[in-house]
Amino acid sequence: MSEIVKSMRQITKENEGIQVYVFMSRAAQQVLRLYGLTKDLENVSNKIFLEIDANRTEPFYYLPGALQVGKFKLFLICPATANTVAKIVNGIADTLITNAAAQAAKANVPIYIYPVDSAEDNLTTTLPDGSKLQLTMRKIDIENARRLSTMENFNVFTNIAVLKEIIDNHP
Protein backbone atom coordinates (compact mmCIF):
# COMPACT_ATOMS: atom_id res chain seq x y z
CA MET A 1 0.00 0.00 0.00
CA SER A 2 2.78 2.44 0.88
CA GLU A 3 4.41 1.82 -2.52
CA ILE A 4 1.20 2.86 -4.25
CA VAL A 5 0.88 6.08 -2.26
CA LYS A 6 4.58 6.83 -2.80
CA SER A 7 4.19 6.33 -6.55
CA MET A 8 1.11 8.58 -6.59
CA ARG A 9 3.06 11.27 -4.75
CA GLN A 10 5.83 11.10 -7.38
CA ILE A 11 3.33 11.27 -10.25
CA THR A 12 1.50 14.29 -8.85
CA LYS A 13 4.80 16.12 -8.32
CA GLU A 14 5.90 15.47 -11.91
CA ASN A 15 2.54 16.21 -13.58
CA GLU A 16 1.46 19.71 -12.67
CA GLY A 17 -2.29 20.14 -12.91
CA ILE A 18 -3.10 16.43 -12.76
CA GLN A 19 -6.43 15.74 -11.09
CA VAL A 20 -6.43 12.70 -8.79
CA TYR A 21 -9.75 11.63 -7.31
CA VAL A 22 -9.70 8.72 -4.87
CA PHE A 23 -12.77 6.54 -4.44
CA MET A 24 -12.58 4.01 -1.64
CA SER A 25 -14.60 1.65 0.47
CA ARG A 26 -14.85 1.83 4.22
CA ALA A 27 -12.58 -1.23 4.39
CA ALA A 28 -9.93 0.62 2.36
CA GLN A 29 -10.28 3.57 4.70
CA GLN A 30 -9.61 1.25 7.66
CA VAL A 31 -6.53 -0.26 6.01
CA LEU A 32 -5.12 3.19 5.24
CA ARG A 33 -5.61 4.19 8.87
CA LEU A 34 -3.90 1.01 10.12
CA TYR A 35 -0.87 1.70 7.94
CA GLY A 36 -0.81 5.41 8.79
CA LEU A 37 -1.30 6.43 5.15
CA THR A 38 -4.45 8.54 5.37
CA LYS A 39 -2.67 11.92 5.48
CA ASP A 40 -0.27 10.88 2.71
CA LEU A 41 -3.20 9.95 0.47
CA GLU A 42 -4.96 13.22 1.27
CA ASN A 43 -1.81 15.08 0.19
CA VAL A 44 -1.69 13.47 -3.26
CA SER A 45 -5.38 13.58 -4.14
CA ASN A 46 -7.61 16.47 -5.09
CA LYS A 47 -10.60 14.82 -3.46
CA ILE A 48 -11.35 11.62 -1.54
CA PHE A 49 -14.77 10.00 -1.83
CA LEU A 50 -16.00 7.30 0.51
CA GLU A 51 -18.32 4.60 -0.86
CA ILE A 52 -21.88 4.61 0.47
CA ASP A 53 -23.22 2.07 -2.03
CA ALA A 54 -22.72 0.98 -5.66
CA ASN A 55 -23.80 4.38 -6.96
CA ARG A 56 -23.11 6.92 -4.21
CA THR A 57 -20.21 8.37 -2.30
CA GLU A 58 -19.77 10.81 0.55
CA PRO A 59 -19.48 13.61 -0.46
CA PHE A 60 -21.82 12.78 -3.32
CA TYR A 61 -20.29 12.00 -6.70
CA TYR A 62 -21.79 9.69 -9.31
CA LEU A 63 -18.63 7.94 -10.48
CA PRO A 64 -20.21 5.42 -12.87
CA GLY A 65 -22.02 8.21 -14.72
CA ALA A 66 -18.95 10.45 -14.77
CA LEU A 67 -16.97 7.65 -16.40
CA GLN A 68 -19.69 7.08 -19.00
CA VAL A 69 -19.79 10.70 -20.10
CA GLY A 70 -16.01 11.06 -20.40
CA LYS A 71 -15.16 13.11 -17.31
CA PHE A 72 -12.09 10.90 -16.75
CA LYS A 73 -9.40 9.89 -19.26
CA LEU A 74 -8.82 6.60 -17.47
CA PHE A 75 -10.01 4.58 -14.52
CA LEU A 76 -7.28 3.20 -12.26
CA ILE A 77 -8.11 0.51 -9.71
CA CYS A 78 -5.07 0.19 -7.53
CA PRO A 79 -4.97 -1.99 -5.56
CA ALA A 80 -7.75 -4.37 -6.50
CA THR A 81 -8.59 -7.05 -3.96
CA ALA A 82 -9.23 -10.65 -4.98
CA ASN A 83 -12.91 -10.02 -4.19
CA THR A 84 -13.09 -7.03 -6.55
CA VAL A 85 -11.32 -8.94 -9.33
CA ALA A 86 -13.63 -11.95 -8.89
CA LYS A 87 -16.71 -9.74 -9.09
CA ILE A 88 -15.48 -7.94 -12.22
CA VAL A 89 -14.62 -11.14 -14.13
CA ASN A 90 -18.02 -12.58 -13.24
CA GLY A 91 -19.95 -9.46 -14.23
CA ILE A 92 -21.03 -8.53 -10.70
CA ALA A 93 -21.34 -4.77 -10.33
CA ASP A 94 -22.63 -4.36 -6.78
CA THR A 95 -19.98 -2.05 -5.29
CA LEU A 96 -18.89 1.42 -6.30
CA ILE A 97 -15.67 0.14 -7.88
CA THR A 98 -17.16 -2.87 -9.67
CA ASN A 99 -20.10 -0.80 -10.95
CA ALA A 100 -17.75 1.96 -12.11
CA ALA A 101 -15.54 -0.61 -13.84
CA ALA A 102 -18.54 -2.08 -15.67
CA GLN A 103 -19.71 1.36 -16.81
CA ALA A 104 -16.19 2.46 -17.82
CA ALA A 105 -15.79 -0.71 -19.90
CA LYS A 106 -19.11 -0.05 -21.67
CA ALA A 107 -18.03 3.53 -22.42
CA ASN A 108 -14.59 2.42 -23.69
CA VAL A 109 -12.76 4.28 -20.93
CA PRO A 110 -9.35 2.62 -20.46
CA ILE A 111 -9.29 0.70 -17.18
CA TYR A 112 -5.98 -0.08 -15.50
CA ILE A 113 -6.12 -2.53 -12.64
CA TYR A 114 -3.54 -3.82 -10.18
CA PRO A 115 -4.78 -7.13 -8.76
CA VAL A 116 -2.91 -7.82 -5.54
CA ASP A 117 -3.39 -11.59 -5.78
CA SER A 118 -1.99 -12.32 -9.22
CA ALA A 119 1.49 -13.78 -8.66
CA GLU A 120 1.97 -17.53 -8.77
CA ASP A 121 4.59 -17.34 -6.04
CA ASN A 122 3.92 -16.84 -2.38
CA LEU A 123 4.09 -13.26 -1.22
CA THR A 124 5.59 -11.66 1.85
CA THR A 125 3.72 -8.61 3.05
CA THR A 126 4.47 -6.12 5.80
CA LEU A 127 1.88 -5.69 8.52
CA PRO A 128 1.11 -2.32 10.16
CA ASP A 129 3.40 -3.17 13.10
CA GLY A 130 6.30 -3.85 10.70
CA SER A 131 6.26 -7.63 11.06
CA LYS A 132 6.20 -9.86 7.99
CA LEU A 133 3.47 -12.25 6.91
CA GLN A 134 3.86 -14.99 4.31
CA LEU A 135 0.79 -15.30 2.07
CA THR A 136 0.00 -18.26 -0.16
CA MET A 137 -1.80 -17.22 -3.32
CA ARG A 138 -4.98 -19.12 -4.12
CA LYS A 139 -5.25 -20.65 -7.58
CA ILE A 140 -8.72 -19.18 -8.08
CA ASP A 141 -7.42 -15.64 -7.43
CA ILE A 142 -4.52 -16.11 -9.84
CA GLU A 143 -6.92 -17.48 -12.47
CA ASN A 144 -9.32 -14.56 -12.00
CA ALA A 145 -6.46 -12.07 -12.49
CA ARG A 146 -5.50 -13.93 -15.68
CA ARG A 147 -9.12 -13.86 -16.90
CA LEU A 148 -9.31 -10.15 -16.16
CA SER A 149 -6.32 -9.54 -18.44
CA THR A 150 -8.29 -10.98 -21.37
CA MET A 151 -11.32 -8.73 -20.90
CA GLU A 152 -11.97 -5.85 -23.28
CA ASN A 153 -10.91 -2.40 -21.99
CA PHE A 154 -9.12 -3.89 -18.96
CA ASN A 155 -5.37 -3.46 -18.71
CA VAL A 156 -3.83 -5.49 -15.91
CA PHE A 157 -0.49 -4.51 -14.44
CA THR A 158 1.49 -6.30 -11.76
CA ASN A 159 4.25 -3.81 -11.04
CA ILE A 160 3.63 -0.44 -9.37
CA ALA A 161 6.59 1.00 -11.29
CA VAL A 162 4.42 1.24 -14.43
CA LEU A 163 1.97 3.69 -12.84
CA LYS A 164 3.99 6.65 -14.10
CA GLU A 165 4.00 5.22 -17.63
CA ILE A 166 0.23 4.68 -17.49
CA ILE A 167 -0.37 8.30 -16.47
CA ASP A 168 2.13 9.63 -19.03
CA ASN A 169 0.27 7.77 -21.80
CA HIS A 170 -3.01 9.53 -20.91
CA PRO A 171 -2.22 13.28 -20.81
Residue ranges and their predicted role:
Residues M1-P171:
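A cross-family phosphate/adenosyl-ligand binding-site feature
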